[in-house]
Amino acid sequence: MAQPLILGVSGASGLIYAVRAIKHLLAADYTIELVASRASYQVWQAEQNIQMPGEPSAQAEFWRSQAGVEKGGKLICHRWGDVGATIASGSYRCAGMVVLPCSMSTVAKLAVGMSSDLLERAADVQIKEGKPLVVVPRETPLSLIHLRNLTSLAEAGVRIVPAIPAWYHQPQSVEDLVDFVVARALDQLAIDCVPLQRWQGGMEGE
């Protein structure tokens, strides 16, 4: 059985990325340990005009409803302030962690080793333990400070997967564009659960 995947949802705009990741992971029967930052609650209100529950079991039902997956896999939600959770420990065994989407505030804190909540602590643990950590920044334009922070993370072994879609798979919907980014993020953990038309070659240079 595959090890659990930690999914961090920060306060960056673009919660649809997290929703689509949950949809595909649960459909493939993965176990997800999810922690949403305090700011992500405000983003749900701003993007969808809905309120995300804070209680873990209710929040798990909320995410399943948003993803349209009633059954399959296992989704465990943690409170953002629960720094004593299992995923806050280096002894917790997992396949890795993806922060999707990842705010520049989260990037900055991780770059200097600061952790003020469970999301940041879990990500910091991945770095110190040498476990896979993927961050998906969704910010533009990027300042020099942003770039330096991302460079620091890359130098520490973190995989940086910007939320930039491709077009060669001829996307027909917003979901197609989002799924490409989700697939590329999960590729970094050798997880292949997103139906995706991958590049087949055939375009010749002039």
Curated annotation (Swiss-Prot):
Residues binding FMN, per UniProt: 11-13, 37, 103-106, 138
Query: What is the role of this chain?
Result: Flavin prenyltransferase that catalyzes the synthesis of the prenylated FMN cofactor (prenyl-FMN) for 4-hydroxy-3-polyprenylbenzoic acid decarboxylase UbiD. The prenyltransferase is metal-independent and links a dimethylallyl moiety from dimethylallyl monophosphate (DMAP) to the flavin N5 and C6 atoms of FMN.
Q: What is this protein called?
A: Flavin prenyltransferase UbiX
Q: Which reaction does it catalyse?
A: dimethylallyl phosphate + FMNH2 = prenylated FMNH2 + phosphate
Instruction: Quote one Gene Ontology molecular function term.
Output: flavin prenyltransferase activity
What is the scientific name of the source organism?
Synechocystis sp. (strain ATCC 27184 / PCC 6803 / Kazusa)
Q: Does the keyword Flavoprotein apply?
A: yes
Query: Gene3D superfamilies recorded for this chain?
Result: Flavin prenyltransferase-like (3.40.50.1950)
Q: Specify the taxonomic lineage.
A: Bacteria, Bacillati, Cyanobacteriota, Cyanophyceae, Synechococcales
Give one Pfam family: Flavoprotein
**EC class of this enzyme?**
transferase
